[in-house]
Amino acid sequence: MSPLKIYGPIRIRSMQTGITKWKEGSFEIVEKDNRVSLLVHYNTGGIPRVFQLSHNIKNVVLRPSGIKQSRLMLTLQDNSFLSIDKVPSKDAEEMRLFLDAVHQNRLHAAMKASQGSGSFGTILGSRTSQKETNRQLSYSDNQASSKRGSLETKDEIPFRKVLGSPGRGPIKTVTGGGMAVTRTIPSLTLTSTPLRSGLLENRTEKRKRMLSGSELTEDYPKENDSSSNNKAMTDPSRKYLTSCREKQLSLKQAEENRTSGLLPLQSSSFYGSRAGSKDYSSGVTNLDRCNVSSQTPSAKRSLGFLPQPTPLSVKKLRCNQDYAGWNRPRVPLSSHQQQLQGFSNLGNTCYMNAILQSLFSLQSFANDLLKQSIPWKKIPFNALIRRFANLLIKKDICNSETKKELLKKVKNAISATAERFSGYVQNDAHEFLSQCLDQLKEDMEKLNKTWKTEPVLGEENLPDTSATKVFTCPVITNLEFEVQHSIICKACGETIPKREQFNDLSIDLPRRKKPLPPRSIQDSLDLFFRAEELEYSCEKCGGKCALVRHKFNRLPRVLILHLKRYSFNVALSLNNKLGQQVIIPRFLTLASHCTESTKPPVTLGWSAPVAISRPLRACQMMNSCITSPSAPSKKFTFKSKSSVTSCLDSDSEDELKRSVVLSQRLCDLPGNEQYQEDVEKDLKLCRLEPGKAELENSGFDRMSEEEVLAAVLEISRREASPVLSPEDDDKPTSSPDTGFAEDDIPEMPENPDAMEIEKSKTITEPGPASFTEITKDCDENKENKTPEGSQGEVDWLQQYDVDREREEQELQQALAQSLQEQEAWEQKEDDDLKRATELSLQEFNNSFLDSLGSDEDSGNEDVFDMEYTEAEAEELKRNAETGALPHSYRLISVVSHIGSTSSSGHYISDVYDIKKQAWFTYNDLEVSKIQEAAVQSDRDRSGYIFFYMHKEIFDELLETEKTSQALSMEVGRAARQAS
């Protein structure tokens, strides 16, 4: 049957990857064993993405996109969204009909009715294989380079098999369940020998596998019985082939010792077997690399020999001379996976990098921050929560330079509130963590207050709208817990409860007794919650002594413990580090510090019901099934003359004509004065409610340019709203995953003069008449018409040249001044960074010998030691490995400090990745894998901050991840079987 494959720009949106950019590629249908899959290939190479279609299609939409072209949009059951644009309308319609058949379970009936016809019956019509061949060959001819073409072929290798017949014939590329494309290539034939994959050749070897003498005698004359070919038997290349037979004999023994599953080498599979042992394991790929046009018409050989061997053709046989990739061994698939990369050190910012890596590893924290549709446009541009979320989203998909800029913005947002973190001085990681969490809570509190006071479009008809204006704070939901302090009078027993909220606990080092083994973090935690006596005046009986007990009133999802390893030295005015060994258990238990009324952690389920129930703008939706790259509301306002001119200045005359017609229609509207007043009102309304315009234009991504213009014109007639440029149609302003706009990354210009220049150029809210004048001026400038007046053409040209020269001089001067200022600023920043780095290295080297710390007692006489019974000690020891006791917490991250003082040294973080189910060490930019046992043993003297997750929450996240991975593997296995 004919293959079903279409080509064009592709964009995919899914829960795992977010939204991708438009990339050239193809959609290919694969059907086998009553299962239908969609393979997405990219021209840039890489592993094809597989999407199961059987019982998985939610919606199929086909829309026009240009002249005789269409855009096909496919929505799956998990709200994954696939789009392919610029597809010929006929091909797109056939694909839509096929997908509809799969959706309605009509595929197999249709295929059974048309079995053996080479088509999909009424679904696909009579598509011949030659037609598909022409389209595929013409498409491959239009590629930018042969490298891209080869990568595209490589991309399709895992799903193709090469079949053929002896002698001259077509090459069939088999795909999926019998779908094939026939390419007729003269003088080239592939036999039915399977691909010899897995045979790797030594890079140092430059020998060629040749045929044995008997095989050559049997096959070669039969394929070459013309006079020209018989003459070629005596030319120099014949001698070359003879000499190669001896080499073949030396390789014969090695060939016999290879895997028994591989078939013996045959004459016509010379290149096929060689390609199987190189980077490109497909015969089709090797054919693409052969220069077919250079062969003589009389050549009738099989693929094993080049026609009319000459020194030039012999040179071409040695492919390694032209392309080094032929000699390169096949790289394992695992090496193609993206290398993990941490955060760059901006200059003594290792404390920030370590804390950010530990926080970002908390999957529930990240979900609460990104998946509750926070209205980011209502949050100030430099707010920490906005910078924080932006870095969290892009840390795994952007390059190191972009990541460095995002880190600077996070640091600036912190420094704006806490000046001690400005500059490049080493700071305490725990202080940074506390400041970060407090600032995130403040930002969320401000957002909720703003959200309650401002009216939201579309909520007038919703019941109980006040309850829909609350967003969950990720810090409160995941990290905050509540402790109840009960003050009990020892005289009368009067109890006074007091509650206190914490984001983390600062616990003391437990005192170590020489004969006993080192204490653990469990001991320090129990030490914190021990009952203690204090002086307290009882209001009831006047007693002066009371007992204080501490119990958890509400548990967190993640418990952060700060181990106080520093003691202040009064003489030196320094915080000396205590290197006492503290055992790091895998599990902690809070059972002895909880009561029957203790509330468990907030259950998973990131979607706050009140926040999700509200009507969301498309730019805020994480899992929306419709992409909405509508322009920001600021683009709905009338722009300055210069900006409109630049917008209309295009090489396309049709676009200019459409703009002129649009402006004339606006001028023809009745009541220009009333129209101007309405425009001013709408502009003010857009400033107050920027989301309104976005809601009205959320569907522009699906429309063509003509439809967008018509829609905007209709809106302007009905509501007197400003006009949206059609050029903004295909420029997404936000990601459907998070709602962040693309302009979140660049900063505002720091030069105030540049901002003043922009303000001076802006014409405030011109009416339709002025818009028409601007368009006409643009038209005149584009046509280079001479203005009417008393001056002649020569005078006007001279004046034009003078003005142009003056403008160029002013532009050059401004550019030179800007470059000088930029260079001076960069030089100053580099000098500061260099000095800070040198200072950090010097302090680190001085304190490195002291980094191991002292194994002596903490020396804190005020700290009591915890005493356990033998049974309690044994139970705690077992729980440290199993987590069997109630309210157990599992270790998921450790922030360690290497050094002797808090103002020097270096911070690193060890993080457990739930998705990869492995531990990783983040040392600024370097990331390495580490075993959990190594974390527990290597950080017992340097561990500073510990993150423990509630065992039930951890198990639920881990089970969810395992289920997701198993499902992905099942889909991949089904796709491989279908191929």
UniProtKB/Swiss-Prot annotation:
* Keyword RNA-binding on entry: no
Q: Show the GO MF annotations.
A: cysteine-type deubiquitinase activity; cysteine-type endopeptidase activity
Query: Where do the record's region annotations for Disordered lie?
Result: 116-178, 192-240, 719-795
Q: Name one GO cellular component term.
A: nucleus
Q: Which CDD domains does the UniProt record give? A: Peptidase_C19, PH_USP37_like
In chain numbering, motif D-box 1 lies across 71-79
Q: Which intervals hold domain UIM?
A: 704-723, 806-825, 828-847
Claim: Cell cycle is one of the keywords in the record: yes
| Catalytic function, reaction form | Thiol-dependent hydrolysis of ester, thioester, amide, peptide and isopeptide bonds formed by the C-terminal Gly of ubiquitin (a 76-residue protein attached to proteins as an intracellular targeting signal)
Major localisation: nucleus
Q: Where is the composition biased (Polar residues)?
A: 135-148
Please report, in chain numbering, the residue ranges of the motif KEN box 1: 32-34
Keywords in alphabetical order, please. Cell cycle, Cell division, Chromosome, Hydrolase, Mitosis, Nucleus, Phosphoprotein, Protease, Repeat, Thiol protease, Ubl conjugation, Ubl conjugation pathway
Which InterPro entries does the record associate with it?
Papain-like_cys_pep_sf, Peptidase_C19, Peptidase_C19_UCH, UIM_dom, USP37-like_PH, USP37-like_PH_sf, USP_CS, USP_dom
* Active site (UniProt): 350 (nucleophile), 906 (proton acceptor)
Record-stated family: Belongs to the peptidase C19 family.
| The name this protein goes by in its record | Ubiquitin carboxyl-terminal hydrolase 37
